[in-house]
Amino acid sequence: MGYDETLYLKILRDTWGYSDFRGIQRDIIRSIAEGKDTLGLMPTGGGKSLTFQVPALAMEGVCIVITPLIALMKDQVENLRRRQVLAAAIYSGMSRQEIVKTLENCVLGNTKILYVSPERIGSELFQTKLAHIKVSFITIDEAHCISQWGYDFRPSYLHIADIRRLKPDAPILALTATATKDVIDDIQEQLEFKERNVFRMSFERKNLAYVVRTSDNKQQQLVHILNSINGSAIVYVRSRKLTKEICEFLLNNNISATYYHAGLEHTTKDERQRKWHDDEVRVMVATNAFGMGIDKPDVRVVIHITCPDSIEAYFQEAGRAGRDGKKAYAVLLYDKSDKAKLLKRIAQEFPNKEEICRVYEHIAYYLQIAAGSGYGRTFHFEVEKFSLLFHHYPVIVNSALKILSRAGYIEYDIDPDSRTRVKFTLERDQLYMLHETTPNEELVITTLLREYSGLFVDYHFIELAFIAHATGLTQQQVYLILTSLSQRRILHFIPERSVPLLTYTQDRVLPEEIVISESVYEERKTQFEKRIKSIIDYAQNDTVCRSRQLLRYFGETETNDCHQCDVCLTHQDTSQSYKDAYNQALKTIKALLADGEKHSITELNKIVLNQEAKDEAMEYLVNEEVIKVELNNIFLKK
């Protein structure tokens, strides 16, 4: 239908209350409205979501939004529904019945925006239903995940090309907050853009001051920073173990804190995230599992205790500070050992191919998979247990699993959504005839039957916290009751487990038959080495404005100094000190020569400490014909 400025502004005003678009929002919206494949590069807080939500309401059909961020899906669907927008989501953890119902609503035209996780789009059910859905356009959020050259490549994103073939007339809108030139080109190639079409918003964050602090005592520096800057904060660390240690350290120093990592139970993660978001807790200590899709605009400081593996990762995580446009800080703590640790990560991320083949062979022994079999089989796989049994380093095993996944031998899902599930094993009539249940057990059973449908037919995901609230019991009591009912075969209770899943995507081969191509190993290793070098250069730089250095990495060369990073402020201090020294040198030279006699430069050197300032002052006085220099002597010019 093309772009109608009046219509699109009316939707923006009536639904979101904004009077006009900002930045490159209008350009992106016009492009997608005209049916063009479009790549939008917008920094964190740049208003990405409106670039697909507004045209989704204006165009006929359903806008499909592919994103890996389940928390973001749920949050945006809830916000859109509050605005009377027909929105829905499909993600891992939903029952087949729920997915079918959601897709049927799309077929019937009862949905305008459908959020889908990349893992779901490859399913037969989704693709079958998609054929009957009128699609307006397809949005790919976090589009850098589709690029083999991106810092956060996700194999599941490669399924997106399947939708392109099923819906060839639906334009693609790809959005990302971090992309180098290689990644920009690769995104458009992977998504089969009909024509190159990129809109770039400057990644400059004028309210964000970038700081690197070199310190031998990072924990002491951390406390100093948090005591100096008020407001909400995120502290990023590299390991799950460190999240707890740093959190306890902050609590011992009277700083409100909690911690977050992928290994925590979903209910625990949700509760800690809520407390931090609602300012019940000030500091979130986390691994990089935290932050994507978290919409908290008033974070005043993001602190990295350990260096990320790339500028892209650092820029995205640091960018979570100051999304409200007010002054905020991004601080990287660096010490003498960090460079060696970063370089060591290269060998950890890319173990030699012989080691990778050994890990593959030992996995087969561990899971008891014979050569020539295993295709399609899925197993719970705990890296720590496996590593201990076969004498491997866990970090090497994790890297080998990623490389074997890229090479096509396995799929490895490190954080599957294995939430708590329940299914009744007794028929409904048998359930009503039970006589050996306690009042609390009857209360839990009644609540399950009232709040969840289809429990006699299939497993259903449940929330222990919700049942506890509905029954007036504690979560621990609900857990023990469900365990007891399961042991007595009244129902089947599967507690939440955050155990990674390993799937054989082809039959097991012998180690000598494994082929790991250059594109999977050598080329990616070279890219990783470049990213490591870039983050080291950033941390060790003390001459170039940090904002300029970051923007230059993303291809923005025509930028100015920020005048607020530690490098700029140091230069300003140095500049003022030099200016003072120069003025003092002028006064000293004039005072020395006031007697009208010749004086030696050696004599002058003894009383002017800053030699650079002295030389510049002498040059100025000579050019102004105030003094004259002959050999080693200076005197006033008559």
Q: What are the residue ranges of the model-derived segments?
A:
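Helicase motor core with emphasis on the C-terminal RecA-like subdomain
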Residues: 2-15, 19-23, 27-49, 56-61, ...
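ABC nucleotide-binding domain signature
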Residues: 64
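Solvent-exposed hydroxyl-ligand-binding patches built from regularly spaced Ser/Thr
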Residues: 172, 637-638
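General beta-strand recognition
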Residues: 209, 635-636
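Generic cytosolic/nucleocytoplasmic N-terminal low-complexity/intrinsically disordered segments
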Residues: 268, 636-637
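C-terminal accessory region of SF2 helicases/translocases
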Residues: 281, 299, 307-316, 322-635
